Amino acid sequence: MRLLFRFLTLVAVLAMSLADVAPAWALTSRIKDIASLQAGRDNQLIGYGLIVGLQGTGDGFRSSPFTEQSMRAMLQNLGISTQGGQSNAKNTAAVMVTANLPPFASPGSRIDVTVSSLGDATSLRGGTLVMTSLSGADGQIYAVAQGAVIVSGFQAQGQAATVTEGVTTAGRVPGGAIIERELPSRFKDSVNLVLQLRNPDFSTAIRIADIVNGYASARFGGPVAEAKDSQEVVIQKPRTADLTRLMADVENLIVETDTPAKVVINERTGTIVIGSDVRVSPVAVSYGTLTVQVTETPQIIQPEPFSRGRTAVQPQTDIAAEQTGGRVAIIDGPDLRTLVAGLNNIGVKPDGIIAILQGIKSAGALQAELVLQ
């Protein structure tokens, strides 16, 4: 646990050092890194396919009958008769195939696809995804996927034991889908550009509009940008401007960013991420744990010889209570370094830090948003 506290302290020191030494570098970004074009969003594709060539780790046809039905239908489409008994081979698996169709993608370009097992297959390693059509929300086919599946995890099993590391029932096919249909796009005919901030913030939106207006005034003779809210900035197209060139110039402008202070907590893994802008008001924290251990040690009582008695079991319960911690620490400071140092002084575990942060927030001493995952 000391390594965790040292790591948190190191992160705090680095964050404060960077803020003191190079504030301009730490707080500025290109517009393309903090905002995306509304007309340039991704579209999701989905399909159903089969993976073949597995080494006995595929679906069982009894527990996954849809896999056998799909395989028979595929073979019939290839002109192969499927009449006969049921196959017991487990080298085929039914999968869902998903992909993201990037904006302005043209036919012939390739995209990555993700495959996920539907049946009781134990591993997709070594398999090959056969030709699978990928459709959009409108039901139209936009891409066709096929190729070797790459799985990061592995599995080894014997008659009495199985060892699995990572996820073996999902994988990727890099560049496995070929785009067959492009999405209708009217980017060149648009009269404005709408930028959407990835982290909505009014201050950042206003600064983007000001930076773009400064560029437009020097280039086109007048302002063209307006911040609609904390997430959207609308840029009107000047008459003499080419929209593609305008977007290329705008996305490379440097803007000073600002985000609200947050503390992100994942209670399942015990992960705690504290932003550099977190502020803490003076607060006293006491943390202690009470451990109660109940142990059952039954005693066997034997009767005296020739007494015609019976062997009996007498229950015996031992209860031990132990209280640890209980120290009081006063956290008084304006920055992240003070918060981390105060938690280190108490010497609690990650689950205790989570409880303390929630308590500090409830007391109104944590000047940040507490995000629980």
UniProtKB/Swiss-Prot annotation:
Gene Ontology biological process terms in this record: bacterial-type flagellum-dependent cell motility
Gene Ontology molecular-function annotations: structural molecule activity
Signal sequence, start to end: 1-26
Localization of this protein: Periplasm; Bacterial flagellum basal body
Pfam families from the UniProt entry: FlgI
Key words of the record: Bacterial flagellum, Periplasm, Signal
Coiled-coil positions: none
One Gene Ontology CC term in the entry: bacterial-type flagellum basal body, distal rod, P ring
Functional summary from the UniProt entry: Assembles around the rod to form the L-ring and probably protects the motor/basal body from shearing forces during rotation.
Protein family membership: Belongs to the FlgI family.
SUBUNIT field: The basal body constitutes a major portion of the flagellar organelle and consists of four rings (L,P,S, and M) mounted on a central rod.
HAMAP family according to UniProt: FlgI
Protein name, per record: Flagellar P-ring protein
